[in-house]
Curated annotation (Swiss-Prot):
Belongs to the class-II aminoacyl-tRNA synthetase family. The gene is glyS. It holds the Pfam family DALR_1. PANTHER family: GLYCINE--TRNA LIGASE, CHLOROPLASTIC_MITOCHONDRIAL 2, GLYCYL-TRNA SYNTHETASE. It comes from Pseudomonas aeruginosa (strain UCBPP-PA14). This is Glycine--tRNA ligase beta subunit.
Amino acid sequence: MSAKDFLVELGTEELPPKALNSLGEAFLSGIEKGLKAAGLSYAAARFYAAPRRLAVLVEQLAVQQPDRTVNLDGPPLQAAFDASGNPTQAALGFAKKCGVDLQQIDKSGPKLRFSQTIAGQPAAGLLPGIVEASLNELPIPKRMRWAARREEFVRPTQWLVMLFGDDVVECEILAQKAGRESRGHRFHNPDNVRISSPAAYLEDLRGAHVLADFAERRELIAKRVAELAAEQQGSAIVPPSLLDEVTALVEWPVPLVCSFEERFLEVPQEALITTMQDNQKYFCLLDANGKLLPRFITVANVESKAPENIVSGNEKVVRPRLTDAEFFFKQDKKQPLESFNERLRNVVFQAQLGTVFEKAQRVSGLAAYIAERIGGNAQNAARAGILSKCDLATEMVGEFPEMQGIAGYYYATHGGEAEDVALALNEQYMPRGAGAELPSTLTGAAVAVADKLDTLVGIFGIGMLPTGSKDPYALRRAALGVLRILIEKQLDLDLVAAVNAAVEQYGDKVKAAGLAEQVLDFVFDRLRARYEDEGVDVAVYQSVRALKPSSPLDFDQRVQAVQAFRQLPEAEALAAANKRVSNILAKSEDEVPPNVDASLLVEAAEKALGSAVANAESEVAPLAAARDYRAALARLAALREPVDTFFADVMVNVDDAAVRANRYALLAKLRGSFLGVADISLLG
């Protein structure tokens, strides 16, 4: 079947930059979905997106649908004909429904069947509907109307190109009649641009100063920004989201280096970077030491004969922004950081849980408690907790919310606070996301864990649990943050005790009954998802969870040991044996003695197992106490042979009550040795 290239381009007013790439992807997805539903084959398809256009190019699209056969089944043969072979009303009705004589109906199968071959339709007649359906399904939160038209789209439409091979596909979509006339760059080539063929689309527009390919523009900008930064003896900060947004703002990108006064470098560089990135869409430059350079890169959408004018204009625009940041910084430094705490007495943390000031007091107490138990400085942790929320009341954070914690660090340093105290004011918010940086100090870790536990206990304590996708207080992230800090920083903290301490600090603000258990279950349940992401089988997690270790670090050490144990050849048999032992002991109506009586060991197999368990117990106990769980399980793996022999040769439930109880005691000792690490019966 013959095929042609297909191109559709919808021209618009400037599209929302943050949504441009996703709109292009959705446009392509919708068209591919429509083509597949129509049975139209093609070789490849891709989208193009620029500020004023969305386009899709489909290569080697079939010019016509294939013919298809439709089978329509009717009544069973026994219902279609009577005993004399005459057609019944059911048969006649089926033939009438199909619009044919009964003679044309297939009677060879168990049911009447009518088969009809439907000729495939030309693709050109189907394409307008496919394109329109895709446009209607674009993820546009709010559509708009323009002029006096009834059509709605994300922005007013300006033109429509639709070519199938060399021919225009005649149609009208979103108030635009299809043609082959596109538009060039708004300033360089404002006139119409004739698209000679779908394959020539990119080059035809390139000649009109338009790079329609989003990926090409993105790569060009990234490359040129890196080159310009290197020329300035620096490196550019290029967040992917900013690069995408800038790419979506320009059709003909021209990066240019601009500068600002060095006096602004006295302001925390994070504030300068925030305002230049978020408000002006500039790429900031850092020196080899990671310090901000007094230069930045803007990406113009025009190739000017006088680029110095564009540079000058951007420098004038950014100056007031930097001046504001400078003003806020100087104003805040006029008073001690701790003085801002008074303002927090009137700032509500949560209506039922009190003010941010009260939260800081609780965080201070809990941070000191935690620091003392992880080897940190309790006094410094308490001080950091007191100061932890002060910067929320500053002018700087009021203008730049992203500066919370960072501003606190600078103001604490300016005020002569200890370095770890100052760092903790920023580190309390770590990790800020999945895989993000963790606190570098014990003081920072203590405050970060305390802050998160305080939030978890408080919100759970008033019954505002996260449900489904709704988690307004980011409790899942808080729980994962606590776990990451304690596990990855190798900090051994009894989380049960810490959560109970957090509950006590709230007093009667929360419903304390069962609260600690609820919070702990929530936190440790987050470990399940963490391990699943790491490829750890859920059974391994459950084998450790059954013991309810109170320290996340201890929990992780056990999980890693069980994961290693599962790779041993003895693991499967011992897991099954432990499950069998668990069932035997659960069904026992006799009281199990605490110790094994060697004089009651009658069979050779039980004597061998008794000796093996006793020896293993003496060796495993110190290993488990030292948390060398991997070595402990490796030692217990040697019990496989005596365990297998015991179950093969020994009847546990004998009539002699004393012997039976002694065998229960032996099995309990065996199981207890493994339970010092995990319940491996759950691995089966």
